[in-house]
């Protein structure tokens, strides 16, 4: 068994699964945070990221594998005996791998810890891709729109771009097989494969349809984006993966080259990731020998400190950090450190509040056990678990950008009373329709506005909020949020 401590971020499909209208399993609530390309997958796919942080390279002090006492040995023997009995004597033949997994799942479930889990070999592969930012594919962002799989954009320099794939190309077949009715994640799985193998996409561009052969390659998805907005540099950090610190350093240097003194570090909806990357990133702004985070297990505490001098180009910069309730884990470690040392002012809304650390142990068969091992505190000793980090200046997110996903399996009509109806009203109001209340009642006034929405969008006019109406409703809200980042605009106005 390979015992190592590294990250667990989201099961984010990244470059080849940008958006989806399919209902997918979530780990917690179904609250949605809309934010540029990041939030598209979250809103339409109903995928919420359970924020997880684990440690790379920090072996906790005095960690030892202890021998089993008599009770532990007795329990272990009992588990082994039950496994043997069921595997050999049960009247129906059993799958030994499934029995083993069920036993492990049962132990993990008993922890009642949302951050501890056992991953199969396949799940571990996806998990590790999330850590590294690397996967094998063609490098094309996709979304499901109007029941079609459409390319949002090919990544620069990717196999997809070199093969001539363009934005708005509609994929109709993969390797000659129709993808009609398939969920986006199923299509992504078909498109991906082994390195140096070929995949043939049938793409529709206008009235033309053609086959495009693309060689799969290892793709790296960057976790940092830099944009200049007037006299402010906006650096968006999507997750904490391998070399995010290097990408952040490059972005800061670009901002310095552009002559910018005011920098916004946008951590909204960043679920976290590698702890050592958070420490390295904090070191860009915090001098050598300073504590970035404290790890605590029982009575033992270890302070993780910066090892280098701060980046000289960053020393005179006015740093602002933008967060929301989707900013979690390593995002909170980074934010907490800069806040405690007065290196940055924090804006937005209260963060998620995850103050525990997971360790992973990988087994020879490729499966992996992830479990909570310790908690962490900010340099000043603040334990933010379940509390989050409060911003210095609150900038509220517009209601429509924090809506719960409405299940598209449900239809709502006059006389219904449901919490999702309030979501419908808030969304329609944001889209410019006249809604006079935000109750959970589906009244005649709402029916009239739903009819107006259906007519305006060339849908069957029924007055009922059905699947087709829901899909268009969601699509338009995403487009609105994509075009108007109200929170960021407010912050930039504050910084002027």
From Swiss-Prot:
A Gene Ontology CC term for this entry? Answer: outer membrane-bounded periplasmic space
Does the UniProt entry include the keyword Secreted?
no
Compositionally biased intervals (Basic and acidic residues): 1-16
Which CDD domains does this entry report, sorted A to Z? cpPDZ_CPP-like (cd06782), Peptidase_S41_CPP (cd07560)
Origin superkingdom? Bacteria
PDZ domain boundaries: 124-206
Single GO biological process annotation from the record:
signal transduction
A Pfam family recorded for this sequence: Peptidase_S41
Instruction: Give this protein's Gene Ontology molecular function annotations.
Output: endopeptidase activity; serine-type peptidase activity
What UniProt keywords are attached to this protein's entry?
Answer: Cell membrane, Hydrolase, Membrane, Protease, Serine protease, Transmembrane, Transmembrane helix
Q: What is this protein called?
A: Probable CtpA-like serine protease
Q: Which organism is it from?
A: Staphylococcus aureus (strain COL)
Taxonomy of the source species:
Bacteria, Bacillati, Bacillota, Bacilli, Bacillales
